[in-house]
Amino acid sequence: MCIRDSIRKAYDKTGDLSVCPMITGSGGLTLAKHLEVPFVQEVIAVSTALTHYAPQTDVAIELGGEDAKIIYFEGGNVEQRMNGICAGGTGSFIDQMASLIQTDATGLNEYAKSYKAIYPIAARCGVFAKTDIQPLINEGATREDLSASIFQAVVNQTISGLACGKPIKGHVAFLGGPLHFLSELKSAFIRTLNLDDEHTIVPENSHLFAAIGSALNLSLIHISEPTRHLRI
């Protein structure tokens, strides 16, 4: 239904055109095989999108719902570091922490705009983070400070857990849903990495860069005839 609905919306805007769906992202390979749709590795998709829209990028930080990535671009080489085993420091972690202070991710973002202090919170695991947050709640820490501390924990986990000492410098792009929709999370990264405006890259539709890149990769895939027709 998702593909059919997307094609229907595209048809309403563009008229009768031949289209080819592409799939990327975590878990996408199995779905692509089932639907007989071309699959593009996510790091390739993101790299392609950055090449087109932000070619000056030296490092890309991408946060998703279940994983986090740092991608280094060095002299034509691409190195990806990914946290795909545990959801600590990702969008789902943020949702879990938000529920502890009876709000959602958007609420965290609004609270964090007025923080006064940052508390140390572990983002490596939701269980450990809860043991850090609950005493702070009991001691009367404000939601504003807790929200900013949760975002800072995500920043620390990403930098220490993925970069592992490798410098994040040059022009840094921020991608993925959490960094697109949560301005204070992005600000925490920028503040921690000491980035100025010149070296901070926030592309338009940054939450869709993997999808954009997968579409741009269509030209690299040979498709002779449509494998399936969808009635819309």
Regions found by a protein language model. Name each.
Residues 1-3, 221-232:
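Single conserved hydrophobic/aromatic residue that forms the stacking wall/gate
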Residues 4-42, 187-204:
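N-terminal glycine/serine-rich phosphate-binding loop of ATP-dependent small-molecule kinases
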Residues 22-23, 37-47, 61-65, 81-89, ...:
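Active-site nucleophile and cofactor-binding loops and adjacent substrate-binding regions
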Residues 26-27, 163-192, 203-207:
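Glycine-rich phosphate-binding loops at beta-strand->alpha-helix junctions
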Residues 94-96, 202-220, 224:
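Glycine-rich phosphate-binding/hydrolytic loop that grips phosphoryl groups
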Residues 129-160:
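Adenine-nucleotide phosphate-binding core of ATP-dependent small-molecule kinases
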